[in-house]
């Protein structure tokens, strides 16, 4: 069995300012997305320029942070938000919802499309290959924070989280790092390396993420304040991923 290494969540300090690993991972994700986007524009000679790319990353960053935090409080911790609404601003403590962030990015992309006259699916197809590595960085942030641990297990790589209990658990943050981050990146990046009908890359991302999340959630301990939310075995993350999967299937079929 393994033991959680109890990593200091603070990466470094600048005087009174404490820089947390979790926030640093988001910064790495956004910078990485810009670099990947820049490479795609140059390599594939896409009809994008650097100003559009920078604006898209800026809009998306706002959508991810605002949507992710609001989504977490609404989907996962609504009672805490009602009683202590100021916790909404404590982003450094963790507590971000991918699905809320996705909705935030959808709104941001809509505003971006209005500004630059691009279609929604064109923007979706461009940004989809840039997302998974950011997701990977976020899951590493979850691991460093010692949050979102897995269910009790007897597998040899089970990890004991001393701040939780003395039972070995699935290191589910690392599973999600591998699935939503590395595997999904390889899938989307390779698929998007050739010209595809508009909407296909977006559809593959929606389906791919939903499937990865549905699998990973089966190893992850449900949020203590929620437990299972449907049928005694579905988690909130799985419930929110099902519409993604259905929309992805529909879009894939519509763009066949």
From Swiss-Prot:
Q: What NCBIfam families does the entry give?
A: lgt
Topology versus the membrane, per the UniProt entry?
Answer: Multi-pass membrane protein
Name it: Phosphatidylglycerol--prolipoprotein diacylglyceryl transferase
Per the UniProt record, the lineage of the source organism begins with: Bacteria, Pseudomonadati, Pseudomonadota, Gammaproteobacteria, Legionellales
Q: In which pathway does it act?
A: Protein modification; lipoprotein biosynthesis (diacylglyceryl transfer)
Report the EC code(s) recorded for this entry: 2.5.1.145
Sites where the protein binds a 1,2-diacyl-sn-glycero-3-phospho-(1'-sn-glycerol): 139
Q: What InterPro entries does the record point to?
A: Lgt (IPR001640)
Known role: Catalyzes the transfer of the diacylglyceryl group from phosphatidylglycerol to the sulfhydryl group of the N-terminal cysteine of a prolipoprotein, the first step in the formation of mature lipoproteins.
Name the UniProt key words of this record, in alphabetical order. Cell inner membrane, Cell membrane, Membrane, Transferase, Transmembrane, Transmembrane helix
Q: What is the gene name? A: lgt
Q: Name one GO molecular function term.
A: phosphatidylglycerol-prolipoprotein diacylglyceryl transferase activity
Give the UniProt family note: Belongs to the Lgt family.
Taken from the UniProt entry, a GO cellular component term is:
plasma membrane
State where it is primarily located.
membrane
**What are the subcellular locations of this protein?**
Cell inner membrane
Source domain of life: Bacteria
Please give the start and end residues of each transmembrane region: 19-39, 56-76, 91-111, 231-251
A Pfam family of the record is LGT
Gene Ontology biological-process entries: lipoprotein biosynthetic process
